[in-house]
C-alpha cells in the first residue's frame, strides 16, 4: 500500500541524516498514515480511509462541508479531486 494520505496528499519525505562527523546517509520520513473508519449518515454506512494525522485534524476541523469546498476550489490534491464521484471522496469529505 502506498504511504499517501487520501485527504492531504502527504507522502514520504526524503533527505539525509547527518552524523556528528558530518557523514551523510540517505533516509526517508514516512507520513503518519492511519486507517480510519468514518460513518456517513447520508448513506447509512461506514467507510475506511487511509489518512495522515494531519488529515484527521483537517476532517475534525472542517467537517465534510469544509473539505468539499476545498476540493471544489482546487486546493485538494489532484488524486482527491479526480475521485469526484466515488464513495471514497464522499467518505473523505465528511
Curated annotation (Swiss-Prot):
Region described as Disordered: 63-94
Keywords tagged on the record: Ribonucleoprotein, Ribosomal protein
GO CC terms, sorted: ribonucleoprotein complex; ribosome
Biological source species: Mycobacterium bovis (strain ATCC BAA-935 / AF2122/97)
Xref: PANTHER family: 39S RIBOSOMAL PROTEIN L28, MITOCHONDRIAL, LARGE RIBOSOMAL SUBUNIT PROTEIN BL28M
Keyword rRNA-binding: no
Name of the protein: Large ribosomal subunit protein bL28A
The family this protein is said to belong to: Belongs to the bacterial ribosomal protein bL28 family.
Listed Low complexity bias regions: 72-82
Polar residues compositional bias, start-end: 84-94
Source species, domain of life: Bacteria
InterPro entries: Ribosomal_bL28 (IPR026569), Ribosomal_bL28/bL31-like_sf (IPR034704), Ribosomal_bL28_bact-type (IPR001383), Ribosomal_bL28_sf (IPR037147)
Family annotation (Pfam families): Ribosomal_L28 (PF00830)
Encoding gene, per UniProt annotation: rpmB1
A GO term, aspect molecular function: structural constituent of ribosome
SUPFAM superfamilies hit by this protein: L28p-like (SSF143800)
Gene Ontology process terms (BP): translation
Amino acid at each position: 500500500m502506498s504511504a499517501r494520505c487520501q485527504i492531504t496528499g502527504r507522502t514520504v519525505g526524503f533527505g539525509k541524516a547527518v552524523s556528528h562527523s558530518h557523514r551523510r546517509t540517505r533516509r526517508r520520513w514516512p507520513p503518519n498514515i492511519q486507517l480510519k473508519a468514518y460513518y456517513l449518515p447520508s448513506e447509512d454506512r461506514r467507510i475506511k480511509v487511509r489518512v495522515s494525522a494531519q488529515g484527521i485534524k483537517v476532517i475534525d476541523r472542517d467537517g465534510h462541508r469544509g473539505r468539499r469546498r476545498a476540493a471544489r476550489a482546487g486546493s485538494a490534491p489532484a488524486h482527491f479531486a479526480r475521485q469526484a464521484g466515488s464513495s471514497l471522496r464522499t467518505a473523505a469529505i465528511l
